[in-house]
Amino acid sequence: MSTYAIGDLQGCHAEFEALLERIAFEPRRDRLWLVGDLVNRGPGSLACLRAVKALGDSARVVLGNHDLHLLAAAWAGAPLKRSDTLAPILEADDRDELLDWLRRQPLLVRDDELDAVMTHAGLPPHWSVTQAAEHAAEVERALRGEAVGDFLAAMYGNSPARWTDELEGIDRLRVIVNTFTRMRFIAADGTLDFAAKEGLDSAPEGFAPWFTYARDDDPRIVFGHWAALQGATPGARVRALALDTGCVWGGALTALDLVSGEYHVEPAHASR
């Protein structure tokens, strides 16, 4: 049995299917980890969502910022942007089934046998794996609860930008969401930067990539989100495995065998 971690799909369904063929994926034998952002920007968002859901227990998924945007559009009426490719999902006959499945996916997956933790954007140095799992569970309960629409309507925002244990209510949940799904550069005190989205040379003064801070524990951290890294984490002081290689932007879709350490790459089928 192999376990493959795959980067951001973002609606690149043709490349996803080709990558599964490339690795000879067998759902009765193998397992997939998907780092989130299954949907948006690419042309096959609906097909990606259906395909991953159909894999059942063979696939483990964490939510990304684009997945949460889809849920906010569905439950809280969040407006779609011109670049969004989410309308086919919202208009699909099976939308309710797909969206209910999506909102029940976690923000963090942990497997001690594989010595790996997966989140969409990474793992901040000031949270242990246990603390991160506890914080993820707080948001997961909100997403699965009856007041999911109220939560999603209040989820957006950049404030507060720094975690403290004293945070309560929506402020607490918003920082957790932003940490798991939007984090790139952070300050030594844990403050998140939301402006810089390019490579490492775009770091604001006083900020550094989250993976350049040492941790007390040292799990393998599987993440996506940051396409500008192109799979590299220079200066890392943790075992960070970057898997978003920008398929939706004309790059590639990448799979990592978490057992053998072998990478498999499917080039984008079209530049966008």
Curated annotation (Swiss-Prot):
Listed SUPFAM superfamilies: Metallo-dependent phosphatases (SSF56300)
UniProtKB keywords: Hydrolase
Lineage top rank: taxon: Bacteria
Principal EC category: hydrolase
EC number: 3.6.1.41
Reaction(s) catalysed (UniProt annotation): P(1),P(4)-bis(5'-adenosyl) tetraphosphate + H2O = 2 ADP + 2 H(+)
InterPro entries on file: ApaH, Calcineurin-like_PHP_ApaH, Metallo-depent_PP-like
GO molecular function, one term: bis(5'-nucleosyl)-tetraphosphatase (symmetrical) activity
PANTHER family: CYTOCHROME C5, PTHR40942
HAMAP family listed in its UniProt record: ApaH (MF_00199)
Protein family according to the UniProt entry: Belongs to the Ap4A hydrolase family.
Described purpose of this protein according to its UniProt entry: Hydrolyzes diadenosine 5',5'''-P1,P4-tetraphosphate to yield ADP.
Protein name: Bis(5'-nucleosyl)-tetraphosphatase, symmetrical
